[in-house]
A protein has these predicted regions:
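Glycine-rich, aromatic-lined ligand/substrate-binding cores of catalytic
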Residues: 227-382
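A contiguous strand-loop segment
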Residues: 21-119, 139-301
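Substrate-recognition/cap regions that form aromatic- and gly/pro-loop-enriched pockets
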Residues: 327-464
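Histidine-centered catalytic/metal-binding microenvironments
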Residues: 445-554
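Short, well-ordered beta-strand elements within core beta-sheets of diverse protein domains
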Residues: 123-129
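Positively charged n-region of N-terminal signal peptides that target proteins for export
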Residues: 1-4
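Bacterial N-terminal signal peptides
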Residues: 7-16
Length: 554
């Protein structure tokens, strides 16, 4: 059957102007502290990183909600507002419900240009109105059916205190009457629960294949799913063998290498089974050798494990971005866009890792069901590239956010000196110049900061749990804001320190206390700096090349 497909991965690999996101999911039985965890990297070359805050509110009967497309901010229409909405900080609400996503595009004829609700609006509406993952899945599907779905194919991570799910959704093929009205409004969708004790992920490719038809404990799906795919000419086999992912998001090289490989990296690092058996799949050589939707980890994962996985560049694998010629002389694990290139008529693509330079914001969110809701939900939030940015903890009950992370402090075309996004970007740009030197030091600062904050969060948990709910909310809001403010000033000092230490390709010598050594005659002329130069493999490559002949000393 001939089908057309729009693959977000193609754009990521070839042109680099599409959105590409990564979600990791860790169920409570797979985490070292018993929390459900969801990560999300909002990757886009035009996305500005800020911490979204939607305060709890009450609305009068008949109130309407204007819908603007997530990202472009294009007005789509309006829908009735709920009588009451919950507090939302980032992508977690006051009931510890967490939602993230990644876009996979899908069949080009399954996009409703007249839909009112895009995926971003559906996510945040669900966070404002729902308390559990199952409620959120049901609401998203119901609203998309009623008002039309304005986005392409999506995978949506949804976790609460007990469960973690993946929802995959795409618009039905539009059919118009003489008035231009879509008679086929609505969505096709499936959802799978990740079994407790397992980990999962998705990264711009649909991953749910077959589903158990009579297992509501573990699967949910559109009532008219099988009726629709038959009527649309997409599938005519038995329901038990129907694959959602293969039908709506057929795999190609770009999806395998640029998207599924990121999932493989997570499974390879922490999975109990040998993921080497799927190398031909993620290399793009054997699309039939699909990875499972979820795997059991070899050990339970800590918050730090999960955060650091978001900083992965395939280190230690055959896809290691620090090792190929594109890494240059400083083991740089980044490739500037466009990622596709051509040599002698052959097309090539660079690797696409979880950590990437164009991240707007990212997070690791925890739902800790053994704690009261104001205390249990924490979103560890960061802006820009995960590999060079620190996380700051924000409790789900917070009624305000730090000015340094708030909406309105700068944007992608306007610099703000008090914006954490711009400050972290300043540091990152410097890291990219000498990644194995500057980047290594920044990573050590990130690690020390996050380990300290985990201890401080544990202490704050204990303090807040002993308080009344009202006092706990006030205390945890203050804790969250002050922690973010402190981090901003810590990063400002780091930015200044790095410039002084690493200026002009040099590295200044330091005393045991961290101060810079001087020449011994005064306190303002430095000692002779160190010249760290380039990686040996880079110099070897130059020496053995045609250019090396020109540089050879005579």
């Amino acid at each position: 059957m001939k089908r057309t497909i729009i693959s977000i991965a193609i754009a990521i690999l070839a042109w680099g102007n599409a959105w590409g996101c990564t979600n990791l999911i860790v169920t409570r039985g797979a985490s070292s502290d018993g929390s459900n965890m969801v990560t999300y990297a909002a990757d886009s070359h035009t996305r500005y990183g800020f911490l979204n805050h939607l305060p709890a509110a009450k609305y009068p009967a008949g109130a309407l909600r204007a819908i603007y497309e997530y990202g472009p901010e294009r007005y789509l229409g309006q829908i009735p507002e709920a009588a009451r909405t919950f507090n939302v900080v980032g992508n977690i609400n006051e009931h510890q419900l967490i939602i993230g996503e990644s876009t996979w595009g899908g069949l080009t004829d399954h996009i409703d240009p007249k839909g009112i609700l895009d995926y971003g609006s559906l996510m945040y509406i669900a966070l404002q109105r729902c308390t559990t993952a199952r409620e959120a899945i049901t609401l998203i599907a119901k609203l998309a059916d009623e008002y039309g779905y304005a986005s392409s194919g999506e995978s949506i991570s949804i976790a609460d205190k007990q469960e973690a799910w993946i929802l995959e959704i795409i618009a039905k093929r539009p059919e118009y009457n003489e008035k231009g009205e879509n008679l086929n409004k609505g969505v096709v969708w499936v959802a799978a629960r990740i079994p407790d004790g397992y980990i999962s992920a998705h990264a711009n490719a649909a991953r749910i294949t077959t589903i158990a038809l009579n297992d509501p404990e573990n699967y949910m799906y559109a009532e008219d799913l099988f009726e629709y795919v038959r009527r649309a000419g997409l599938y005519d086999g038995v329901p038990e063998e129907f694959s959602f992912a293969d039908t709506f998001c057929p795999l190609d090289f770009s999806l395998l290498r640029g998207c599924e490989a990121r999932v493989w990296a997570f499974f390879n690092k922490f999975g109990a089974e040998d993921m080497g058996r799927y190398l031909d799949f993620v290399r793009g050589d054997n699309p039939a050798n699909r990875m499972p939707l979820y795997v059991k980890p070899a050990r339970k994962l800590s918050l730090k494990d999960v955060a650091d996985m978001m900083r992965d560049h395939y280190e230690g694998t055959e896809f290691d971005m620090t090792q190929d010629p594109g890494a240059g002389g400083h083991s740089l694990p980044y490739r500037w866009r466009p990622m596709g290139f051509e040599v002698d008529g052959e097309k090539y693509s660079q690797e696409r890792a979880i950590a990437t330079q164009q991240t707007g914001f990212w997070f690791v969110a925890q739902s800790r069901g053994w704690l009261p809701d104001p205390v249990g939900g924490v979103i560890w939030f960061g802006v820009d590239d995960a590999a060079t940015s620190p996380l700051t903890p924000v409790y789900c009950c917070a009624t305000e956010v730090s000015d340094h992370y708030a909406f309105g402090q700068g944007n992608m075309v306007q610099y703000s000196p008090i914006s954490m996004f711009w400050l972290v970007n300043r540091v990152a740009q410097f890291c990219y110049l000498r990644y194995n030197q500057v980047g290594t030091e920044v990573r050590s600062v990130v690690d020390a900061h996050e380990m300290e904050m985990m201890e401080r969060v544990a202490a704050a948990d204990a303090m807040a749990t002993a308080m009344s709910p009202r006092k706990a909310v006030k205390y945890l809001t203050r804790f969250s804001v002050e922690a973010a403010d402190e981090l901003f000033y810590k990063w400002k000092s780091l930015d200044e320190y790095l410039l002084v230490k690493y200026i002009d390709g040099n590295t200044k010598q330091q005393n045991p206390d961290g101060s810079f050594k001087t020449n011994g005659y005064n306190d303002f002329v430095p000692a002779k700096p160190m010249f760290p130069g380039y990686d040996k493999q880079f110099l070897d490559a130059i020496g053995r090349s045609e250019w090396g002949k020109r540089l050879k000393e005579r």
